[in-house]
């Protein structure tokens, strides 16, 4: 059993539509635990830094503006194979292609307003977690 951490964002469109609780319930139903969470309003510098790998791409400025458009929830999830399991729960980036029952199929408005972000690898998860959380802000919980 490989317990790992992953990083997740509930994006501005989902926060605005009061979907935080619904998304958290879906995460917890998978057996993953939320071990750190906070609400933020990203600055331009934070959004640009977080999405630096996309700098220079045609959608970069729009993505940064969207992520600054309202509060976001950032959280650390922990569980067995958390990166893969959370990506499966999220569904494909394009909600029209996302599996029925996935977060994006159920909650996303469009490819741009797709409600959630999740790390795509354990390495990305570690980098993204460290971008928003100090180690002492993460509170592992014993498994039941």
Curated annotation (Swiss-Prot):
UniProt cross-references to Pfam families, sorted A to Z: NDK (PF00334)
Record-listed ATP binding positions: 11, 59, 87, 93, 104, 114
Active site: 117
Example of a GO cellular component annotation carried by this entry: cytoplasm
Gene Ontology terms describing biological process: CTP biosynthetic process; GTP biosynthetic process; UTP biosynthetic process
Record GO terms (molecular function): ATP binding; metal ion binding; nucleoside diphosphate kinase activity
Biological role stated in the UniProt entry: Major role in the synthesis of nucleoside triphosphates other than ATP. The ATP gamma phosphate is transferred to the NDP beta phosphate via a ping-pong mechanism, using a phosphorylated active-site intermediate.
Subunit structure comment from the entry: Homotetramer.
Name of the protein this chain belongs to: Nucleoside diphosphate kinase
Gene: ndk
């Amino acid at each position: 059993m490989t317990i790992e951490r992953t990083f997740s964002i509930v994006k501005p469109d989902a926060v605005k539509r009061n979907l935080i609780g619904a998304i958290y319930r879906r995460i917890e139903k998978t057996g993953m635990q939320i071990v750190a969470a906070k609400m933020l309003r990203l600055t331009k510098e934070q959004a640009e830094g977080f999405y630096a790998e996309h700098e220079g791409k045609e959608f970069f400025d729009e993505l940064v503006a969207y992520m600054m458009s309202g509060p976001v929830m950032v959280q650390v999830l922990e569980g067995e194979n958390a990166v893969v399991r959370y990506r499966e729960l999220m569904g494909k980036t394009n909600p029209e292609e996302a599996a029925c029952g996935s977060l994006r199929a159920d909650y996303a408005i469009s490819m741009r307003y797709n409600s959630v972000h999740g790390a795509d690898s354990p390495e990305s998860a570690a980098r993204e977690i460290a971008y928003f959380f100090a180690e002492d802000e993460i509170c592992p919980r014993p498994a039941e």
